[in-house]
Amino acid sequence: MENIIEKIIYASRWLMFPVNIGLSFGFILLTLKFFQQIIFILPNILTMSESGLVLIVLSLIDIALVGGLLVMVMFSGYENFISKMDIKDDSKRLGWMGTMDVNSIKNKVASSIVAISSVHLLRLFMEAEKILDNKIILCVIIHLTFVLSAFGMAYIDKMSKKIKNKK
């Protein structure tokens, strides 16, 4: 009976596969949004203000960061929880694939969230005259919470590795 239960639990890892497919669709939507922004910029580039252009470029950076985060979560999640990716040509295999454990994924996700939050905060500061001070303060507090959380997770990971190495 125990053997059957273990096989069922182990096979259930494939339930993550549709989640990864959903993330792939999310990445497609982000790509469409990215090119929508590019298409919007092109006819207006000569009449657009510098700050307007910077805001749109920040949006593009934001989309790129979220897209990179999605790719990292999809690939590492697949390799860690579902199955190893069999890429015949090793020269095409991404260098970090197969090397990220759950803790390193968490740290990379946390640092990506901090980077995304930084871009949002910069965009907010560029439009500060249009935004209530309370909203800016709240966004700074949220950003600092992300930063402290990322540091905390990295510290815990570092300490657990030290303890593991002592054993």
Swiss-Prot record:
It is found in: Cell membrane. GO terms for cellular component: plasma membrane. It comes from the Bacteria. Keywords: Cell membrane, Membrane, Plasmid, Transmembrane, Transmembrane helix. Its main location: membrane. The chain crosses the membrane at residues 15-35, 53-73, 136-156. The keyword Transmembrane applies. It is a multi-pass membrane protein. PANTHER family: UPF0114 PROTEIN YQHA. Belongs to the UPF0114 family. This is UPF0114 protein in repA1-repA2 intergenic region. It comes from Buchnera aphidicola subsp. Pterocomma populeum.
